[in-house]
């Protein structure tokens, strides 16, 4: 957020106070727990927000639960406009390599384009970093599509290893020893 404010030449203020003792809400098992987690984790500073055009910056949008609740909170605090900027590309595919993301059909970006996501979340505008922009931020000139420098499957759907227990859409598939080739 500090970097975005500096590049956009707009003031940076702590309009949302974050409780650092609450963990990542997107990995919680139920909507009810995720919603409670968002309420416990974030509080709006109405004195700084009321009557202003606000730009929220977040690392990602997974289901959209946190984004939606934060936008509602900021609007309730009196924001005139709410815009959101995301520091990663849209998460369109599940991660099967250690990040506890939901099934693909639960990912907001898997089923909606950016304008639909903006409407669902309740923001006036929504923008994401592109895949190449993410690579530039990590010091690369761009993504090498023949041999990606990093795992970016959650953004591109191009998994570095085949998923033996998933079909081509990332849905659970029945494993079969009959399909396995023996060396």
Which functions belong to the PLM regions below?
Residues 1-183:
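PRPP-associated nucleotide enzymes
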């Amino acid at each position: 957020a500090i970097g975005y404010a500096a590049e956009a030449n707009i003031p940076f203020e702590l309009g949302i106070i974050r409780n650092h003792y609450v963990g990542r809400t997107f990995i919680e098992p139920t909507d009810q727990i995720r919603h409670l987690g968002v309420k416990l984790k974030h509080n709006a500073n109405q004195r700084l927000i009321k009557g202003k055009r606000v730009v929220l910056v977040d690392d990602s949008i997974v289901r959209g639960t946190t984004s939606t609740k934060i936008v509602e909170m900021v609007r309730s605090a009196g924001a005139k406009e709410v815009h959101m900027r995301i520091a990663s590309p849209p998460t369109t595919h599940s991660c099967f390599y250690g990040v506890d993301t939901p099934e693909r059909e639960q990912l907001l970006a898997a089923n909606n384009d950016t304008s639909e996501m903006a409407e669902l979340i309740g923001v006036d505008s929504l923008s994401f970093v592109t895949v190449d922009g993410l690579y530039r931020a990590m010091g690369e000139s761009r993504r090498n599509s023949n041999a990606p420098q990093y795992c970016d499957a959650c953004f591109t759907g191009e998994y570095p290893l085949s998923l033996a227990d998933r079909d081509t859409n990332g849905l659970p598939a029945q494993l079969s020893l009959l399909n396995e080739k023996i060396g």
